């Protein structure tokens, strides 16, 4: 049975202990190589997985680390010392261009905590915001200020949790990052079945946002809503004031907006175009970009039926002269006026009288 915290007893890419003095070539089987190359075990592809029950692999299925290193630039040697929990395996990530990822090997219960996340401790003033800080998490003080960052970008500070990728959207997210004390943990937010990649991002289930005090949780929001009829302005101002970016102190009215904004500082771009692999920090920006590939134009003008791929294009069109209806449409039911001549004043008066008579309501005696 799996405990509430994933144990740190795992081994070299496969279940079971590595015997003392066992060479790396003796534990890398064809099945492990298949997983490394294609991202899943063979049984996921409909083939039967034949595990070697002994500690020694068959010479026909064993591959030397030197041969693998030539193909993967020494990645296998790095992974040979990686300690994995028995509940997970490492394989090619399902996210394009992200390299290796962590997949569940057995069922992982909701609420299971993994960690702590390890790495170098960096003071906030020493963080280079121009770098790719995807492998970095912030740790907060009780007053909501950043205490330090945990950076796992250097190889000698990496653990198996480093290979867990960030979720691109809420639908694929199955882990959330939580702060317990001064340590960072990943927590399963749902029951995770076998052969599913572990993907993490910030969560909403706790009364604090990544341990930041003062951010209203569910219970606090429910209490606040009871008093909104009496203090609506104060309530809205207080919520926006508490949800502030810890780096630039900009205020937000929701946690999702704050999480999206934080990607500007971390340079995290989890949204990848499936056509050109270009990366974006916002899902809405990715959707607009994909329309350039697909030719989709969902925004249509109701007057002239012109179509646009982005809402900004439609709004610009609506402000232009092309969007205005023809002026003749307003004159369709107006009587034609004669050309001006010497008796124009008299004719104009007669036309006005006729028009007035035309619009007088009929009276029934």
UniProtKB/Swiss-Prot annotation:
GO biological process terms held by the UniProt record: detection of temperature stimulus involved in sensory perception of pain; methylation; negative regulation of transcription by RNA polymerase II; neurogenesis; neuron projection development; sensory perception of pain
Keyword rRNA processing applies: no
Zinc finger (C2H2-type): 243-265, 271-293, 299-323
Biased composition (Low complexity): 329-338
Record has Nucleus as a keyword: yes
Any Pfam family matching the protein: zf-C2H2
CDD domains according to UniProt: PR-SET_PRDM12
Molecular function terms, GO-annotated: DNA binding; histone chaperone activity; histone methyltransferase binding; methyltransferase activity; zinc ion binding
Gene3D superfamilies reported for this sequence: Classic Zinc Finger (3.30.160.60), SET domain (2.170.270.10)
Main location: nucleus
SET domain mapped to chain residues: 86-203
Keywords: Activator, DNA-binding, Metal-binding, Nucleus, Repeat, Repressor, Transcription, Transcription regulation, Zinc, Zinc-finger
Function: Transcriptional regulator necessary for the development of nociceptive neurons, playing a key role in determining the nociceptive lineage from neural crest cell progenitors. Initiates neurogenesis and activates downstream pro-neuronal transcription factors, such as NEUROD1, BRN3A, and ISL1, specifically within nociceptive neurons, while repressing non-nociceptor cell fates. Essential for the proper function of nociceptors in adults, influencing both their excitability and their gene expression, thereby impacting how these neurons respond to various pain stimuli.
Name listed for the protein in its UniProt record: PR domain zinc finger protein 12
Primary gene name: Prdm12
């Amino acid at each position: 049975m799996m405990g509430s915290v994933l144990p740190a007893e795992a081994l070299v890419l496969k279940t079971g202990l590595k015997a003392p003095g066992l060479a790396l070539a003796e534990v890398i089987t064809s099945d492990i190589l298949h997983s490394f190359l294609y991202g899943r075990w063979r049984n996921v592809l409909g083939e039967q997985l034949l595990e070697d029950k002994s500690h020694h692999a068959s010479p026909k299925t064993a591959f030397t680390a030197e041969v693998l290193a030539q193909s993967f630039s020494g990645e296998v040697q790095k992974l040979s010392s990686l300690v994995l929990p028995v509940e997970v395996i490492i394989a090619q990530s399902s996210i394009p261009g992200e390299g290796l990822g962590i997949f569940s090997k057995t069922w992982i219960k909701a609420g299971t905590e993994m960690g702590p996340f390890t790495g170098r401790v960096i003071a906030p003033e020493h963080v280079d915001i121009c770098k790719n800080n995807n492998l970095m998490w912030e740790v907060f003080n009780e007053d909501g200020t950043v205490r330090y960052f945990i950076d796992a970008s250097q190889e000698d500070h990496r653990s198996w949790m480093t290979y867990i990728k960030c979720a691109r959207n809420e639908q694929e997210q199955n882990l959330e990052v939580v702060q317990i004390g001064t340590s960072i943990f990943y927590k399963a937010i749902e029951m995770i079945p076998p052969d599913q990649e572990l993907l993490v991002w910030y969560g909403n289930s706790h009364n604090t946002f990544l341990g930041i005090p003062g951010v209203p949780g569910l219970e606090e929001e429910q209490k606040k809503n009871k008093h909104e009829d009496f203090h609506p302005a104060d309530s809205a101002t207080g919520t926006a004031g508490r949800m502030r970016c810890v780096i630039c102190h900009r205020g937000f009215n929701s946690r999702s907006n704050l999480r999206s904004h934080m990607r500007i500082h971390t340079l995290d771009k989890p949204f990848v175009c499936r056509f050109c692999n270009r990366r974006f920090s916002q899902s809405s920006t990715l959707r607009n970009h994909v329309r350039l590939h697909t030719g989709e134009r969902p925004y249509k003008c109701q007057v002239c039926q012109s179509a646009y791929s982005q809402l900004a294009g439609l709004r610009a069109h609506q402000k232009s002269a092309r969007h205005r209806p023809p002026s003749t449409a307003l004159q369709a039911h107006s009587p034609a006026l004669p050309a001006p001549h010497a008796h124009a004043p008299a004719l104009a008066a007669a036309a006005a009288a006729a028009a007035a008579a035309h619009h007088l309501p009929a009276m029934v005696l």
